[in-house]
Amino acid sequence: MAIAESFKVEDGFSVLAGVVARRDGTVEAVAVDTATVGGTDATEAAVRIAERLLKPDVSIIMLDGCVVSFYNWIDGEALWRRFGVPVACYVFEDPEGRVEEAVKKLFKDWELRIEAIRRLGWPTPYYTKSGYKIYIRSWGIDPADAGRAAELCAKFGKWPEPIRVAQLVASGVREYLSRRSR
């Protein structure tokens, strides 16, 4: 299972999409939810998606990033503890490390946000057999095993297919909702 999001600051909301897919990439189920851009509710949106999609044969929850929707966040440990399914958060570009500076400038509740983001931990680099470098935070699974899980279902480049499809769904739904609200 994978969860990805799409947002534009001016919309005020982000769309999170969850996809259940088999290892071969065949999509079995999709669910969507929303979170607030710059809010603190992305974990709750991810929980609602997981409640709708999780089945006994889902072996991992893959997150396309943990800091989402303009410094909102998904707490991978909370998902793991709630559902008992390993959670891996993937970052496909080098983490910049300037998150704390930006959060302090942008938010009155910056201390809460920085504490939550620090609790996520620093991602571990993982090198795929194809030579890609991805960064992984994980709960209930070793980062190297989470990296191998991502490789097993990657069809194009470094992105696991369930994450790629979840990104497409989230983007399409966000575009639709954004156009409707104009």
Swiss-Prot record:
It comes from the Archaea. Pfam families: DUF99 (PF01949). Transmembrane segments: none annotated. Belongs to the UPF0215 family. This is UPF0215 protein Pcal_0119. It comes from Pyrobaculum calidifontis (strain DSM 21063 / JCM 11548 / VA1).
